[in-house]
């Protein structure tokens, strides 16, 4: 899980979602997991 100021899709499988008011990226590739913070 990467914590970043700006979350971006890193590949076509990445999905940008909101959970509990936080913007997150979920993907089949675990390296692409990010959240904003």
Swiss-Prot record:
The keyword Aminoacyl-tRNA synthetase belongs to this UniProt entry's keyword annotation: no
Entry similarity comment: Belongs to the bacterial ribosomal protein bL36 family.
Membrane-crossing residue ranges in chain numbering: none
GO cellular component: chloroplast; ribonucleoprotein complex; ribosome
Intracellular or extracellular location(s): Plastid, Chloroplast
Sorted UniProt keywords: Chloroplast, Plastid, Ribonucleoprotein, Ribosomal protein
Organism: Ostreococcus tauri
GO biological process, one term: translation
A GO molecular-function annotation: structural constituent of ribosome
InterPro entries, sorted: Ribosomal_bL36, Ribosomal_bL36_sp
Protein's name according to its UniProt entry: Large ribosomal subunit protein bL36c
NCBIfam families: rpmJ_bact (TIGR01022)
């Amino acid at each position: 899980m990467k914590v970043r100021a700006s979350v971006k899709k890193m590949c076509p499988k990445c999905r940008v979602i909101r959970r509990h008011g936080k913007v997150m990226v979920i993907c089949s590739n675990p390296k692409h997991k990010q959240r904003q913070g």
